[in-house]
């Protein structure tokens, strides 16, 4: 199985309290989102040779958070998303270690204003050696 898919499934498993799921084509209607929706998407794999027999792999996944809500809920949602993202840093999953957490966007003002939807995306970078 693909290493980046293994990481995506491990991340979703870690976020099982939020009913996270791995999806390849996430698409939702706001009316279908009652609770926070957490989606994990495999994003990228990068390989760098270290020697003739070993290489480094950088595996990236994105974790999307969607919730119907307004500006009054924003501080709590931001704290939740930041806490979840930072909780992965230095954590080992599926044989790889999380070496980077990026929030992009930490939230989307456009989605909040125009749709009444909180949208946040975390990009997690993992490193492993083979």
What does each model-identified segment do?
Residues 33-43:
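Short, well-ordered secondary-structure micro-motifs within conserved domains or adaptor modules
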Residues 1-30, 43-130:
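Charged, amphipathic alpha-helical segments and their flanking helix caps
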């Amino acid at each position: 199985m693909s290493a980046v898919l293994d990481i995506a499934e491990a991340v979703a498993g870690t976020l099982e309290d939020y009913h996270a799921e791995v999806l390849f084509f996430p698409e939702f209607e706001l009316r279908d989102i009652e609770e926070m929706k957490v989606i994990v998407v495999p994003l990228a794999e990068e390989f760098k040779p270290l020697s003739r027999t070993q290489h480094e792999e950088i595996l990236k996944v994105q974790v999307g958070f969607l919730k119907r809500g307004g500006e009054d809920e924003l501080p709590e949602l931001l704290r939740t998303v930041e806490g979840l993202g930072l909780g992965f840093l230095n954590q080992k999953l599926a044989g790889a270690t999380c070496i980077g957490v990026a929030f992009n966007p930490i939230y989307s003002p456009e989605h909040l204003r125009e749709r009444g939807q909180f949208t946040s995306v975390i990009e997690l970078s993992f490193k492993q050696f083979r």
